[in-house]
A protein has these predicted regions:
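Catalytic domains of carbohydrate-active enzymes, especially glycoside hydrolases
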Residues: 27-52, 287-288, 438
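Conserved, well-ordered alpha-helix/loop/beta-strand core segments that scaffold catalytic motifs
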Residues: 186, 190-219
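Outer-envelope exported proteins of Gram-negative bacteria
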Residues: 47, 210-212, 216, 290, ...
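Surface-exposed amphipathic alpha-helices with a cationic face
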Residues: 37, 197-205, 330, 354-355
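Domain-scale activation on soluble regions of proteins
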Residues: 38, 164, 171-172, 474, ...
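Mature N-terminal, pre-catalytic/accessory segment of carbohydrate-active enzymes
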Residues: 1-40
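Alpha-amylase-like alpha-glycosidases and glucanotransferases acting on alpha-linked glucans and related
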Residues: 4, 12, 18, 56-194, ...
Length: 502
């Protein structure tokens, strides 16, 4: 079957324009969908929608299933009558339209959402009751987890009192009674998130725009998932990790990356027929049209680092579940659209797993000319892209195209010019030639980060791996979505046979 050529834009929900401190499911999100349609795009790729924790990373969430309350539209709550426009306008979310001030966001949004809950009379809402019943398999544990975390002043669950840390039944019953209204508050937030996200996704689909969601391979240690299902993770009898996730040293990081996530106890998953993973992916496809799985190579082999290590250096490779997991998923769910994030260190067995799965892998232009790459740079040259792949200029973890070109070596810049056969275009405009380069590649799908279409520098970078403090903050300004840019994107998308004519 011939694969339809298509294109899309990568923009996190958090990066949408908004007067309330962070991008959310407000009118600006609907306007962006309309803008995507006018540019001829087929896909809107986003980052994980989970509840963020310390460091604000969407890849370290308190739950694999819960949504981020920061994305709840305050305007929609005003329309419901549980907030007033004056209350929202009075809140101080920070002064910069292109930045997210998470400390202010935590205080101001939290206050407003609690106010909305107090006025909601949610206990008499039949839709809320139905939502709670339908989702109780994850919602009950998550809401209790968040309520107890509040009682213990935000401490990770492995530092809670022993009775609730180990989920002894008397303690579970006690906290459910003691924290009843706090538990209901967290259920209310998930209800509003779910309601608003499904409405936005339905609107996008009605305009011919499909959503590419993103899930991390691992859950966070401090998550409701690890607390509620300790037997599925490599934890000891006291529910403390024995080993954690990361990646080994390479040309980009001399000590590797220590992520700290608990590793899966794959034999326990296998014994259940991979039910937890099947359920997780089923739920993802309730929310998204296509799912990108981060760190796909971890299903072939995963890097195991002894708990307590200061760097990833002492780690070693362990065998993962391989294709068996995805055969079980396909048997349960049928064929689904998954993108395998197969970047980084690649072995022959990882490549074979991607081939066996049939999922498209990822091709990132920036990796094609980088001397720090560990030997597979030619895989990322656009003339080598297979049809069954998704081409990117860069991802949320990369420098923007403009800054990347400025920071690579003279020799690498010469390689770019030679490959483009372009010696005349000024440096500051060369990003357009690079975007056109991957748009005309054979890859069936091509996704361009919004910052690259805008020609922005690293001030608009989403994330710099292995750093904390200044990540996940960039926001798009509404004035940047110009008619001129819209026309330019549409022309290039059409020229290379990727326009969505729906």
């Amino acid at each position: 079957m011939k694969m339809q050529r298509s294109a899309g834009i990568l923009l996190p929900i958090s990066s949408l324009p908004s007067p309330y401190g962070i991008g959310c499911f407000s009118q600006e999100a609907y306007d962006f969908v309309d803008w995507l349609k006018e540019t001829g795009q087929t896909y809107w790729q986003i980052l994980p929608l989970g509840v963020t924790s310390y460091g604000d990373s969407p890849y370290q969430s308190f739950s694999a299933f819960a949504g981020n309350p920061y994305f709840i539209s305050l305007d929609a709550l005003v329309e419901e009558g549980v907030l007033t426009a004056a209350e929202c306008k009075k809140a101080n979310f920070g002064r910069k339209a292109d930045d997210i001030d998470y400390s202010r966001l935590y205080a101001e949004r939290g206050r407003l959402l609690r106010l909305a809950y107090s006025r909601s009379d949610i206990g008499h809402n039949e839709a809320f009751t139905a939502f709670c019943e339908k989702n109780k398999w994850w919602l009950d544990d998550f809401a209790l987890f968040m309520a107890v975390k509040g009682r213990f002043e935000g401490k990770p669950w492995i530092e809670w009192a022993e009775d609730i840390r180990l989920r002894w039944q008397p303690a579970m019953d006690y906290y459910r009674r003691e924290l009843y209204f706090e538990v209901e508050y967290h259920k209310y937030l998930q209800f509003k998130f779910d309601q608003q996200w499904r409405r936005l996704k339905a609107y996008a689909n009605s305009k011919g725009i499909r959503i590419i969601g993103d899930i991390p391979i691992y859950v966070a240690l401090d998550s409701a998932d690890a607390w509620a299902n300790p037997g599925l993770f490599q934890l000891d009898k006291d529910n403390i990790p024995t080993a954690v996730a990361g990646v080994p040293p390479d040309g980009f990081s001399p000590t590797g990356q220590l992520w700290g996530n608990p590793l899966y106890r794959w034999e326990a998953h296998r014994a259940t027929g991979y039910q937890w993973w099947i359920t997780r992916l089923w739920y993802c496809f309730e929310l998204y049209d296509v799912v990108r799985i981060d760190h796909f190579r971890g299903f072939d082999e995963y890097f195991s680092i002894p708990y307590g290590s200061e760097t990833a250096a002492p780690g070693h490779w362990e065998k993962g579940p391989g294709i068996e997991l995805f055969r079980a998923v396909e048997q349960a769910l049928g064929k689904r659209e998954i993108i395998a994030e197969d970047l980084g260190y690649m072995s022959d067995t990882v490549r074979q797993l991607v081939r066996d799965s049939g999922f498209p892998g990822m091709k990132v232009l920036e990796f094609a000319f980088d001397s720090r790459d560990t030997g597979s740079a030619s895989d990322y040259l656009p003339h080598n892209y297979p049809v069954n792949s998704v081409a990117y200029t860069g991802t949320h973890d990369n420098e923007t195209l403009v800054s990347w070109y400025q920071t690579i070596s003279d020799a690498e810049r010469a390689m770019v010019r030679d490959y483009l056969y372009d010696y005349a275009t000024p440096d500051e405009q060369l990003y357009k030639s690079m975007i056109a380069l991957i748009l005309r590649s054979a890859a069936a799908r091509c996704i361009i980060p919004m910052q690259d279409w805008l020609g922005l520098d690293n001030a608009a970078r989403i994330n710099k791996p292995s750093t904390v403090g200044q990540n996940w903050r960039w926001r798009l300004k509404k004035t940047q979505l110009t008619k001129k840019l819209q026309k330019e994107i549409c022309q290039l998308t059409t020229r290379y046979g990727r326009k969505n004519w729906a």
